[in-house]
Amino acid sequence: MENFQYSVQLSDQDWAEFSAAAEECGLLQAGLASGDEPLSSDTDQRDSRGSSPPGPSPFLEGQLTPGGSSWPSFEEEDKAATRQLVSRSWHEPMLAPEAGQQTPSTSAQSEARLSLSPGATPLVQGSSLPGPVSSRDEMQRLLRGPAPRGPAPTPTGEPAGSPESPVHSAAPQRSPGSPGAPPRSPGRKKRRTAGTKAGGRSGGPGPAPTQLDSPLLTEAKPEDSFGPAGSRGKGLPAGAAKQTAGTGPESAGAPEQVAGQGPGVDLSTSVSTTEQGTDRLGMSPRADPCAASTSDPGAPLDVTIKSDVALSTPASEPQPDKPQSTPAFKPQPDEPQSTPAFKPQPDESQSTSAFNAQPNEPQSTPTFSPQPDEPQSTPAFKPQPDEPQSTSAFNAQPNEPQSTLAFSPQPDEPQSTPAFKPQPDEPQSTPAFNVQPNEPQSTPAFSPQPNEPQSTPAFKPQPDEPQSTPAFNTQPNEPQSTPTFKPRLDVDQLMPGPVVQPEVDSSMPASKAVPCTALPHLVLEAGSDVGVSTPPAPTPQAGPDMVEAEVVPVAKLGLSPVRSLEGHQQNPRGEPSTDAPGHHTGEPPLGPIQAPKKKKVRFSMAMPSSEEPGSGEVSGPLSPATAPRMASGGHRGSGAWDSVAVGPRSPQPRILKHLPPPAPSASMGPGRRSCFAVTLPEAYDFFFCDTIEEEDEEAEGAAEAAQAPAEVQWPDVCEFFFQESQIQRSRHQEGRSQAPLLKAGSVPAPPPGDPMPISIPEAYEHFLEEDRSGGTLGPAALLQMQATEPSRSVLWGVGTGAPPESSPATVEQLTLAIREAVAPRGPLTSFTFSQKDMCMVFVAFATWAVRTSDLHAPDAWKTVLLANIGTISAIRYFRRQVERGRHSRSRSPSPSSSPSP
C-alpha cells in the first residue's frame, strides 16, 4: 500500500465510501506507516487542492491518507526522503507528518493536523467526532508503536481535543468552504488508508474536523509537533507540547509556555513552542506536520521539504532548529531553506507563497515559524512570549499559528495563505500589527511580497544562521534588505508593512512570534534583533529594542538598497517603530503607507535616501526627518525634491534661454537691433515685423514729403492706371475751369508749396498718356496750366487785384521748362508699355519660361498653364488691334465687318 498511489480524483461521496472501506481494511495504519505520504502530501497538496473534490476533506481529517493519495505523483519522488523522515520521526512524527502533509495536502489543514499525530487526530476528531477519534486513536496507537508520540498524542489528543476542540470546530467551519482539503484527501491511498479509519469514522464530520483542523491543526499540530518535538527531544513530552499548543491557542500563556519550553519561539507563534517544527505546525499546519513527521531534521526533512515544501518547509522541521528556520524556508533544506525562502518560490511560496497563498505555503507562513525554531527565534520569542506584544501577536494570533491557521482564512491554503492571510487572522496578528492588518504578522510584510519578504527575510537569514543571522544574513532577508531586494514588492509592502517585512524577514527567523507579534515594527525590530542579537534580548523589548533592532537591521540588514528605499521608508516606519509598541498597530500602517509613497520618493530621491540610510542608526534618526517628509506626503516630498532640483533648474535654463533674450531686448528697447542675443522668435519679429513697420513709416514720410498724402493713396493710383484717357482729360478740363473760377473769385488758395505740385497719378498720366490726345505738349501744357494757374490766382488774390505783369513770362518759362523736361522723354512715350507691348513681353516671357524650365518636373504644369493663358490673351489682343487698324484704314461701311471687341 505504501508504494501505491492514487492519482484519481474522487468526489466527496466516493471518498466517504472509500474511507469507510479503507477503515474496514485498516488502511489507515498502512497509510500512517508509509513514509512517502508526508513528502508527497506536500507537493500533492498543491495539486490536490485545485484538483481534488472538497468532499475528501472530511476523510482527510479522519484520514489524511486520502489527501495523501491525491498527491501520488509527488509522493513517489519524495517517498525515499519521506520515508527517511518518517523513519526518523516516523514513530509519531510519521503520523504527524502524514497528517501535516495531508493537512497541507488537504485544504483542510486541520485534517492534516488530525492525521498529523494520533494526538492531533484525536483532537480534531474529538472536536468534530468522538467516534472517529477513538478509531483514530487506535490507528494512532498502532502508529505510536513506532512513534514515541503515541502516549503523548493519546493524552494530549484528548486534552488538546477538548481545548482545541473549539478551535477545531471553528476551523472546520472555515475549512469546509475550502475544497483544498478534499483534493488532498484523494491525494494518496496511504493517507486514505490511514485517514480512512480515523477519517472514515469521522467521514461525515471529517470535513468539519478537517477544517477545524485548520485552526485545530494549528493547535493540534502544535501538539503533534510537540509530540514530534518530544521525540526530537525538544524537551517537551507530547503531552506537554500539546498542552502548550492548547495553551498557545487558548492564550498568550501558551506562547509563554512555549517560550519556557525553548521551542517556544515557534510555539509562541505556533502556540506550540515545543518545537519550531511544532510551531510551524501550528503556524503552518503543513510545515508542522512535516516537522512532526520529520521529527528528524534530517534528510527526510529535506525530502519532505522538497516534495512538500509547504509541509516540510513549514516543518522547517528540517532541522528542528536550524531547519526550522531553514525548513520554513525549506527552500533548501539547509540554507536554501532559508535562502529558498527566497527561492521559495515554490517554497517560498510556502514561505512567501504562503503569502502567495500557495495553499501549502502556509507553512511557509510558518516560515515565520520556520525560523521559529531557530532557537534564536525561540529566544526572541521567549522574550516575546513575555513581551505582550509578542504574546499579543501570538495571542492576537495566539494561534496565529492557528491564526495563521487562520490559515483557516483559507482553509486550505488557509494555513499557508491564511498565515499570511492573517489578514483575516491578522486580527491577532493585526493586534500586533493592527497597523497593517496584513502586515501584522510578518505575513503582511510577506504578503506584500508574498515571497520575498517572508522568504527572503526568513531565508536570507540563512537557514539558520540562526534566524538572526539569517535575518541579516540575508540581507536578502534583510527584510529590509528584501525591500532592497524587491524594493518594489517589498517596498510597497514594505511600505505598507515595511517594518513587518523587515520584521518578517528578521523576525521570521527570529520567530514567528515576532512576525505574529504583528507589530510591524516589532517584527521588524524583532527581526533586527533576531538578526542582530539572537532576538532574545531585542525581541523582548519589542518597542524600543525593536526600534534599535530596526535601526541595526537597517544598517545591518543592508538596507543599502533598502536604506535608501527602506531607510526612508523604514524610517518613517521606524519612527512609528521608534514610538515602539504603540505604533505597532497604529503607526506602522502610517509608516508603511507613507513608506510606499516614500518609496517612490526614495527612488526618485536616491540621494536624500542615501543620506538617511547611512546606517541603521542614521536611518533611525533620519527616519524622523524622512517621516516628516513622508508625513507631509511621500509624493510631496518627492515633489519638493523635484522642485528644488528641477524647479530651480528649469528656471535657470529658462532664464538662460528666454529671460536673457527678453531682458536684453527689453532693456535694449530701441537698440534691439544691436542686440544679437535674441531668440528666433524675437529675431523673426525684428527682421520682419519691425521692418514692415519701418517701411510703412518710410512710406508715410515720403508721402509727407510729397505733401500729397491723400493723392498718394493706393486707390487713387489704381484709378489712375485703370482710368481711360478721356476721364483723365475731363479731369484736366475741370481743373482748367476751376482756375478761372479761382481767378474770378480771387478766393484764397492754399499756399503754393512747389511751383508744380502734381500728384503721382497726374505724373503718370503725363508720361504714359498715349499720343491720341494730340500734340506731345498737350498733356504737359495742361499740367503746366493747372499747376501754374493756382499760383497766379493766389498772386492775384493776394496782390492789388491786378494780374502781375510777369505772369506771361512765368508761363513761358514754365512751358519751356516742361518742354525741356518732356522733350527728352518724347521718345520714351513711344516706349511706354501699352497693352500691345505687354502682350509681346508676356509672349516672350512665356516662350522663355517654357524653353528653360523642365517640363517633366512635377510643377511644370504651372509654368505651361501660365504661359498658355498669357499667350492666348496676347494673341486675342493682337487680333483686335489688327481688326481696328483695318477698320480705321478701310473705313468700310459695313459695321459688321469689324469684329466686336
UniProtKB/Swiss-Prot annotation:
Bias (Low complexity) ranges: 157-178, 608-624
GO cellular component: cytoplasm; nucleus
InterPro entries: Perm1
One of the GO BP terms on file: regulation of DNA-templated transcription
Subcellular location: Cytoplasm; Nucleus
Polar residues bias locations: 100-112, 267-276, 347-379, 387-418, 426-457, 465-484
Domain of life: Eukaryota
Region (Disordered) residue spans: 29-511, 564-671, 731-752
Protein keywords: Cytoplasm, Nucleus, Transcription, Transcription regulation
Task of the protein: Regulates the expression of selective PPARGC1A/B and ESRRA/B/G target genes with roles in glucose and lipid metabolism, energy transfer, contractile function, muscle mitochondrial biogenesis and oxidative capacity. Required for the efficient induction of MT-CO2, MT-CO3, COX4I1, TFB1M, TFB2M, POLRMT and SIRT3 by PPARGC1A. Positively regulates the PPARGC1A/ESRRG-induced expression of CKMT2, TNNI3 and SLC2A4 and negatively regulates the PPARGC1A/ESRRG-induced expression of PDK4.
Protein name: PGC-1 and ERR-induced regulator in muscle protein 1
Organism: Bos taurus (Bovine)
Phylogenetic placement of the source organism: Eukaryota, Metazoa, Chordata, Craniata, Vertebrata
